[in-house]
Every structure is written in C-alpha cells, then in structure tokens.
Amino acid sequence: MPKLRSATSTQGRNMAGARALWRATGMKENDFGKPIIAVVNSFTQFVPGHVHLKDMGQLVATEIEKFGGVAKEFNTIAVDDGIAMGHGGMLYSLPSRDLIADSVEYMVNAHCADAMVCISNCDKITPGMLMAALRLNIPTVFVSGGPMEAGKTKLSDQIIKLDLVDAMIQGANPNVSDDVSEQIERSACPTCGSCSGMFTANSMNCLTEALGLSLPGNGSCLATHADRKQLFLAAGKQIVELCKRYYEQDDTSVLPRSIATKEAFDNAMSLDIAMGGSTNTVLHLLAAAQEAEVNFTMADIDRLSRVVPCLSKVAPNTQKYHMEDVHRAGGIMAILGELDRAGLLNSQTRTILGMSIGEQIAKYDIKLTQDKAIHKFFRAGPAGIRTTQAFLQDCRWDTVDDDRENGCIRSKEFAYSQDGGLAMLSGNIALDGCIVKTAGVDESILKFSGKAIVFESQEDAVSGILGGKVQAGHVVVIRYEGPKGGPGMQEMLYPTSYLKSMGLGKACALLTDGRFSGGTSGLSIGHCSPEAAAGGLIGVVKDGDIIEIDIPNRRIELMVSEEELAERRAEQDKLGWKPANRQREVSFALKVYGYFATSADKGAVRDKTKI
C-alpha cells in the first residue's frame, strides 16, 4: 500500500518543526494523515485566459476539503503569447513551458504533496503542467479556465465573428481604414478565456480530454458560462477520489502514466489531426511523452496524419466556427466518438473518471446519449457581454448541433478532407521532419514550388514583408529561430498574418525552424529539424534557391546539388552555424535554455547528454 508522500513532513517527532509550520498555514490536528493536495493555479492579470482564475483555486480547494483532503494552493507564471508576440518577449514563451514544469516539480516535491489539481488555460501553461504531472506521476486532474467567447462586429451590414488574428491582419492592412481597424480591435477579444479559435491553448485543453486527464467539456465549455463552475467543483471531488483509490486501495491505474499511455498519446494526436489543431501541440505532445517515458515520436505523428481525416474546421481555419460552436456540436467527446466509429481510436485507454475512453464517449457523445442533462450541458453558449468574470451567464442554444454532414463536427464520411488537418513533411532540408497545418492550407497550393527569400530573424522577415521585398511565388525562409538558435523558438504569427495583409496569403509559402501560433493558417511550415543552429540544411539556403513543397506526398526539398550543399555545409562549419549580422540581445537565462535545447522533433526539451 503506497504511503502518503506528505507523511514525510507530517508524521513522527522529528517532523515537529514541519508540523508547526503546517499548523501556521491553517492545518488542524485532524488534518494530519489526510492527503495534501496541491492546487496548482496560474492566475495573472497579464493574460485574458487567466485573469478570471484568481478565485478558482479556492473554489477547488473548498471542494477538496469538503470530501476529505487538505488543499494547498500555489501559483505558476503564465506568459501571454499574443502580448509577447512580435518582439523580444516571444523569446521567453517556449522556455516558460519548461520553467513551469520545473516550478511545479519544485513546489510539489519540496512540500511532499500527494496529488494535484492543475488549473491551466493558455499556450505554455497546460503543456508545462502536463509535463510536470507526467514527471511526478502522482494523482492529477486538469481543469482549464475555458475558451473566450468569439468576438462579433457588424461590417457592411453583416455580423461577422472575430478573434485576435483578425485584429492583427486588419491592423497591418493598408487598405483598411483606421476606424474599421479600431472597430475590429475593440471587438476581437470580448471576454476572459483562452482565444476563441482552435489555437494552441484550446488545442492543448482539448487534448487533455483525449489523454484522459481532464473531465468531459474541459476543452470547449466557455469561460463565461455557469456550467464551467461545475467542472471546477467536480475536479475537487474527483482528485480526492483518485487519492483514495491510489493511497488506500493501491490502484495504480489512476496515476498519470497509467492513463497517458502510448495509445492515449495516439488518441490525443489523432484528435489534433481531426480538429485541425495548432502545430504547437506536436511540440508539446513530444515533450510530454518524454516525461511519461512513452516512445511517441515524429514517426507516429506521420503515421497518424496519413489515416486520420479532418473532421472539424475552426478559426483560424475558418471564421464560421469557434470553440463555442465546437461545444454546441458535442465538444471533444463528439469528435472522439466520430474517430471511434471510424475505427481510428484506442477506445480502451483509461480516464480519471475510472472509465475507458470508449465508455466515456458512450456516456457523453450527443449522438449516442439521450441524457437531457448532457444535451443541456452542450447547449451552453455565449452571452455577448464584455466581461473578465467567470461563470457570469447561463445562455443556451435552442438545440445542439448534431449535423455530422454539414455541421461544425463531421463524420468520416463527410469529412472536410480524408487526409487530416496536420502533416509531417521531410526531405533534404528537413531530415528530421517539419510540420504544416493542412487544415489551414488552400487546396490550390498543396503543391508549391518557389524561390527562397531568406531572413535571419523574424524581425527582418516582418520588415521584408511589409516593405514589399516578398513577392508572389516566394518561399519565405526564416531561420535561426529554433529552440537553440533563437533561442526560444519564437512564434511566427506576425509574418504569416502580414503575408495575408499584403494579399500574399495564397501566393507564398513560409518555412522556418521556429514555430507558429495556433492562430496561423496558410502554407506555413514550421519546426524544421534539425534547426539551423544545430547544422540543419535550412541554414545553407540562399536567396533564389528553389524549394519544392508537396504536401500530398509529404515531401519538401531544397533543389540544390549535393556538391553545392557540401560546399555550403563546409562554409557554415567554419562560421559556427550562426545568423549573419543579427542584432539581438540574449539574456543569460535564455542562453542557458538555448544551450540545453534540442530541436523541435524532440519536443524542444533539454538535451540530457549535456547534463
């Protein structure tokens, strides 16, 4: 029978000092011997996805103590990628993921906590906490802050849906008036919550459902809706149940590594492909798998991308649907249900509810259940009220969207494409692979050949795009922006958005060893591995080189002879594979991150051979 980890600091005369300190935190005599459950919050006023989380930790804590646990809350940092975007702040975004994972480990192990409830929401916070949960392997429940309502405004007598990316694109479009640009800016992000499309934050929160580590609805129920409160309350109750099963019944099936198995990672990646999720999820799943000691690699992603269809298109891949529409269509359980019926899901993987994912689908998929409470839950909709307050409204759609032919979520028979929403490409310029979100690529450019125009940094690329250097037919190459070369692997949302602003969204490709925001669409290929700073061939591309991209056949090639490539490699070996004439201040903390960082195909985790 496993002993409570917290007994290390609460039992025996030698721990009198520790107990005295625990008492000073509010613990009573009868609390010693109960599981101490860490409530890992991420409240901050810097991030709209986290601005409403201040009271969520204590909401969960009260429920934990109601059912027999002792709750102790602490906070992690949280970076807003949208606010950090387009300047030096973005260098810190991806490194913050690993810092979050480490900080959770430090707090939980230093204080010998028995279990965790992870309250996350935005881009690097959910992955960081996920890495920590799989590293620590103690009972854990994830509950997120929930998606933002879609922005809405009236243009040309039509109501249109908006998000952050629309504000960025229109703000840089010289043909859009100041008044219209400001109108869009003011309307794009109306409430608290993670940005309203299938960007990185929402993608990752959806994936925790597929991994089995969060409750149904976690990825899709709006931050503003009263129903989300029930998810927080249920998380508090469920973590106590998991503690009892593990510490009192020796049931190891409730542990994160028992739930997030290789098959569960396959399910999560299949979900991401089916819903056209962010390419960042690839990076984070690879990193999480390493923490779980699961052999999940780019080869698995390639395998799945060839068989899983694209069942849902959500902003930024279309402006018709946002996360509020995914929820109305049955949420993640509905997409997993369609994958299951298509024979593309491992239905025997386990969840924190003690069910198999197949049993959970049977209970929560609106196509399978007639339970009125389940249908009511998935009718939860937006109120259209500007607010930073959680649980403010109880608006509901009249009906759920169960149209699997033309609705937000499709069946395999009526899929947007049979080829999935993400693809891994490989070739001489990306020997270890690169990633493209095919759900966001126009069919006319699935095959593309163009001349390279090379930039040594994101900043130079932005200047080149807005300055008219980039023309139709170009392949924009942005290099030395990988985990090591940045350092920090910046997101390239501004370059991709500005290509659209300049009318080049369907006329150019973009290739980088950096990464993309979940808000990116278009022929945007990232995670090029090995990265330039690690000796990847993207580091030897020259202006005018022809790059051929063939998404249907999963190929990307630099059309330069082997002899010429050998000469260029030798030249870069002498130069140390560093960007030419880049002016960038890099702090000591970022230099340390860059020194240990691996390329994107390894999840940009630390290189353990250097330790």
Curated annotation (Swiss-Prot):
The modification N6-carboxylysine is found at residue 124. The active site is at 517 (proton acceptor). GO terms for biological process: isoleucine biosynthetic process; L-valine biosynthetic process. The keyword DNA repair does not apply. Gene3D superfamilies: IlvD/EDD C-terminal domain-like. Pfam families: ILV_EDD_C, ILVD_EDD_N. Binds 1 [2Fe-2S] cluster per subunit. This cluster acts as a Lewis acid cofactor. It comes from the Bacteria. GO terms for cellular component: cytosol. [2Fe-2S] cluster binds at residues 122, 195. It catalyses: (2R)-2,3-dihydroxy-3-methylbutanoate = 3-methyl-2-oxobutanoate + H2O; (2R,3R)-2,3-dihydroxy-3-methylpentanoate = (S)-3-methyl-2-oxopentanoate + H2O. The keyword Cell division does not apply. Its cofactor is [2Fe-2S] cluster; Mg(2+). Keywords: 2Fe-2S, Amino-acid biosynthesis, Branched-chain amino acid biosynthesis, Iron, Iron-sulfur, Lyase, Magnesium, Metal-binding. Its EC number is 4.2.1.9. PROSITE patterns: ILVD_EDD_1, ILVD_EDD_2. Pathway: Amino-acid biosynthesis; L-isoleucine biosynthesis; L-isoleucine from 2-oxobutanoate: step 3/4; Amino-acid biosynthesis; L-valine biosynthesis; L-valine from pyruvate: step 3/4. One of its GO terms (molecular function) is magnesium ion binding. Homodimer. Belongs to the IlvD/Edd family. Functions in the biosynthesis of branched-chain amino acids. Catalyzes the dehydration of (2R,3R)-2,3-dihydroxy-3-methylpentanoate (2,3-dihydroxy-3-methylvalerate) into 2-oxo-3-methylpentanoate (2-oxo-3-methylvalerate) and of (2R)-2,3-dihydroxy-3-methylbutanoate (2,3-dihydroxyisovalerate) into 2-oxo-3-methylbutanoate (2-oxoisovalerate), the penultimate precursor to L-isoleucine and L-valine, respectively. This is Dihydroxy-acid dehydratase. The gene is ilvD.
